[in-house]
Amino acid sequence: MTLLEKGHHPRFHIGESLLPMNMPILQRLGVLEQVRAIGVLKLGADFPNDSGGYNTFRFAQALGAQSEYAFQVPRADFDRVLFAHARGAGADLREGIKVESVQLDGAQPLVQARDADGLRQFRPRYLIDASGRDTFLGNTLKLKRANPRHQSAALFSHFRGVARRPGEDAGNISIYRHAHGWMWLIPLPDDVMSVGAVCDPEYMKTRQGDSEAFLLRTLALNPDVAARMQGAQRIAPVHATGNYAYECTRMSGPRWLMLGDAYAFVDPMFSSGVYLAMHSAERGAAMVDAALRDPASEARLQRGLERHLRRGLNEFKWFIYRFTSPTMRELFAQPRNVLQVEQAVVAMLAGDVFDNRAVLRRLRVFRAIYAMSALAMLPRAWRAWRHRRRQAREQFHGDTLHGDKS
């Protein structure tokens, strides 16, 4: 296996909050203890409630919990652990080499890439696009489409001196809402806090001048976040990224496959990105191995993989599309475990959205509860739906990470 990486490790990357469903994958890879050593223990997710406190959804409460914890990780350190492990397992890892073109019409893919010594060619038996939000094949093959139902943009950075939640909740991710979207606080080692605000593109267009000032003004929109940020010091650049939501019209073709964000991304809400990438990579690797052993089965295997991954992605999408709605706000602020529905929602927050039929059945019950609650507050729900539809048509330009590729 040869991996072509255009950058060099360590490097900055978003995606610092793992899910409990990452833990079995890390265990199978043999790196769980290494990740434990660099991470902060995460036992749940905190959402403010109407009484001024928090509703903490603890992963131990998840229906059929496969892991009761996860970790918050400095992403550069996490990637370094995985990169070193892959090299130790025999992978040919090349850094500082940028893929410039691919040809997929021959018996084997042809990849042309450039490093410091010039142009190089590769003819892999199978081509896997794991380029993340750069979406190399999606752009090359013109398969990438903006999500017509959801768009958002974000500003984020790292700070020291941000107040943490007390006791065993100190490592939890905290999710707050504001008038134009939502915010995250992710505790990292060494008193570092990853802080970000995900916003409607319409609101992001009001940004003028200094990005740090705009981020701080946005964070001040939520009094609880402002209180936790008192006395905090920024220790990293403020980054902006936008046009989050996209999906490619297909995931695969003869001898090629897209994985993770290279195929689709919706929103950083619920911290699903790293888990979806790793789950798709594990399933994708098994699919490629089977297809190379039996080429006649490739198309069938690819269809099965795409159905499987779309199913889980669609579960996250349903919640993400509605999270900032007044209906979802009330349901999360006043959770009730009728028919184990709350436990199923916690399982979703843990990433268990693919194969657990008990969870999936109860999430359908939650959808029915949501629909009835929305009818009970129909004018507010209707206004929120119209606002979301308007934002889905907006585009944000000013990405500091991906050059506004969309």
Where are these regions (language model features)?
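Short beta-strand to alpha-helix junction loop
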Residues: 62-84, 205-210
